[in-house]
Amino acid sequence: MSESTVVRVDPSNERMLKAWNGDDGALWAKRAERFNDGVAAYRDTFFSAAGIQPGDRVLDVGCGAGQTTRDAARLATAGSALGVDLSGEMLGLARRLAGEEGVPNVSFEQVDAQVHAFPEAGFDVVISRHGSMFFGTPLAAFANLVRATRPGGRLVLLTWQPLRLNEWITTFRTIIAAGREVPSANLALSDPEETEALLTSAGYTDFRCTAVNKPMYFGQDVDDAADFVIEQHGGRLSDLDEATRAKAVAALRADLAEHQTDRGVFYGSAAWLVEARRP
């Protein structure tokens, strides 16, 4: 599908479609390598839990530019991996990279996983690396994913722990607020008890949630990291007058400098590794 393809979405996901098939998706496509590098420390833990076997059929939900989908396909050597996302631009990049990297058993579709008619019991493993937190109606979405999973099939997610436990989010939001009130926000699927109740109601069993804390990479040095962070938060900075904006950028650069290591700029991050199974 192309970026101009009409995507059938649930009304509760119209806002997400506008964002991810628009400016947000364009930024993530432009910066795909950096976003992947940022959470690279989670890769081994994530795929170890997924336990993808050579013949598995894998569904990657919210796949973005498809790094995890391609990685899954490389493990499912006699199987396949399908990545789905709302962003036409990121999926275009995902297809191009799959071709360049020579991954033949991978495909990508621009669909709303909450309502898309996946094949009944068509997948052995459903994975999502920070891509399952945006559904407008989560119960309907996960019920749809249960239906798409074979009996005994597995669900493996990475989701963020609460904001207060993620240094990178709280630091950048506070600095860029520049004295203004920091907008309230809750990260979906950040409460294990709520996530267990949700997945159980959707039809999953054998729920398990494990805390995983990893350093998150933002750039090779202060200049590189500052460009990346400012690009993501440009809207909030543009609301400031010139002097206040300059102070905010200076404060950001100072904080980035405090997190500079010989391997680059890193901040603490905290995720949940969520596992469940279709009975």
Where are the regions a protein language model picked out?
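Conserved catalytic/acceptor-binding region of the Class I
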Residues: F35, L139-A140, V146, R150-G219, ...
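A short acidic, Gly/Pro-enriched loop at the edge of an enzyme's catalytic core
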Residues: Q114-V125
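Class I SAM-dependent methyltransferase SAM/SAH-binding core
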Residues: R57-H116
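A generic alpha-to-beta junction signature in SAM-dependent methyltransferases
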Residues: A50-I52, L75-A76, T149
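Conserved Class I S-adenosyl-L-methionine
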Residues: V6-V9, A19, R31, V39, ...
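Conserved hydrophobic residues forming the short capping helix/wall of the S-adenosyl-L-methionine
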Residues: A76, A98, I176, L199, ...
